[in-house]
C-alpha cells in the first residue's frame, strides 16, 4: 500500500515538473514584425565619415568590396541582419500600430529600416566578393521580402520606405545578372521567384487606406473644434481618398491619366484636407521606379 502511494506521489510530482518545464517554452510567434523590431533596435551605422562614404560608394558599385574596412561593420551588425533575414521566412507581419488610437510611426523607424536594408545589400556584396553567389542572391531576396513586409499595415511613409528597400536589393540582383556573376541555373531559379513579386512591389492602396483612416479620424475629431470642418469638405476628402486608392490598384501606366483627372478634385478640397493628403503623383512615380527595376532584372535574367 505504501509503495503504491509513493509511486502515485512520484507520478504527480513528475507530471507537475513536466508541466512547468513545458510552460517555460511557449511556441514562437509567426509575426515577423516582432523580430524586425529587435533587429531595428540593434542595428548600428558606421561611426566615422570615411567608412560611411566607403559604404555608400560600395553599395553604389563605384568601388570594389574592401573586407578590412567594411567587414567589421557587417560583423558588428551580424545579429541584427540574421534576425531580419530569419523574420522574412515567417508568414505574417503586423507592425502593431493602432493609427485610429493616435499611434504614429517613430521618427527613427524609417531611418533604421533603410540602414538595415543597406547593410543587407552590403552583406550580399560581401558574399559575392567571396565567391558565394547563391548566398548573395538569397541575401538580396530576403531584403526584397523585408521591404514588402515594411509596407504592410503602414501609411504612405512606410510604403515609400518599403519601395526604397526593395530597390536597394533588386538593383544588385540586376547588376549581378548583367555582369555574368550568376550561372544559368541560378538565373532560371531567380526568374521564377521574381515573377511572383508584384510589378510595383506590393499593394500601395493599403498605405493610402491607412492615410485615409488617419485623416478621417482627424477630421471627425475636428467637428468638436471651435471652427469645425464642414460635412461637405469631409465628404469631398473621403471621396478623393477612395478614388486615390482605386487608382493605385491599377497599373502605374494606367494610373497616370487617372491621377491627372483627379487633380481638379484635389485643388477643390479645403486647405486642411489638402494638407492631410500625400502626393498621389509622387506615389505613382515610386511605383514606376519599382516596375522599371523589376523589368530590368527580368531582362538581365533572360539574357544568355
Predicted regions and their residues:
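Bacterial N-terminal signal peptides that target proteins for export
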Residues: 1-7
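Bacterial N-terminal signal peptides
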Residues: 7-16
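Short acidic linear motifs
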Residues: 16-304
Amino acid at each position: 500500500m505504501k509503495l503504491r502511494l509513493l509511486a502515485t506521489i512520484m507520478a504527480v510530482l513528475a507530471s507537475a515538473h513536466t508541466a512547468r518545464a513545458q510552460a517555460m517554452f511557449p511556441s514562437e510567434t509567426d509575426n515577423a514584425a516582432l523580430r524586425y523590431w529587435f533587429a531595428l533596435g540593434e542595428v548600428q551605422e558606421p561611426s566615422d565619415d570615411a567608412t560611411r562614404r566607403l559604404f555608400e560608394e560600395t553599395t553604389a558599385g563605384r568601388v570594389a568590396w574592401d573586407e578590412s574596412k567594411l567587414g567589421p561593420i557587417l560583423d558588428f551588425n551580424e545579429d541584427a541582419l540574421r534576425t531580419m533575414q530569419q523574420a522574412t521566412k515567417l508568414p505574417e507581419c503586423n507592425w502593431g500600430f493602432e493609427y485610429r488610437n493616435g499611434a504614429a510611426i517613430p521618427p527613427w523607424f524609417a531611418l533604421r529600416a533603410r540602414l538595415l536594408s543597406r547593410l543587407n545589400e552590403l552583406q550580399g556584396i560581401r558574399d559575392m566578393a567571396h565567391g558565394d553567389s547563391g548566398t548573395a542572391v538569397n541575401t538580396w531576396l530576403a531584403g526584397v521580402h523585408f521591404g514588402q513586409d515594411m509596407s504592410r499595415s503602414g501609411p504612405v511613409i512606410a510604403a515609400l520606405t518599403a519601395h526604397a528597400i526593395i530597390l536597394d536589393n533588386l538593383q544588385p540582383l540586376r547588376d549581378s545578372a548583367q555582369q555574368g556573376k550568376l550561372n544559368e541555373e541560378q538565373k532560371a531559379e531567380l526568374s521564377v521567384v521574381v515573377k511572383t513579386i508584384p510589378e510595383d512591389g506590393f499593394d500601395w492602396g493599403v498605405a493610402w487606406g491607412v492615410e485615409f483612416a488617419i485623416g478621417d479620424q482627424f477630421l471627425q475629431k475636428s467637428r468638436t473644434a471651435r471652427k469645425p470642418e464642414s460635412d461637405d469638405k469631409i465628404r469631398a476628402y473621403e471621396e478623393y481618398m477612395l478614388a486615390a486608392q482605386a487608382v493605385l490598384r491599377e497599373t502605374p501606366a494606367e494610373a497616370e491619366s487617372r491621377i491627372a483627372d483627379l487633380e481638379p478634385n484635389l485643388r477643390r478640397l479645403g486647405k486642411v484636407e489638402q494638407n492631410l493628403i500625400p502626393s498621389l503623383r509622387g506615389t505613382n512615380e515610386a511605383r514606376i521606379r519599382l516596375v522599371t527595376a523589376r523589368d530590368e532584372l527580368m531582362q538581365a535574367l533572360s539574357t544568355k
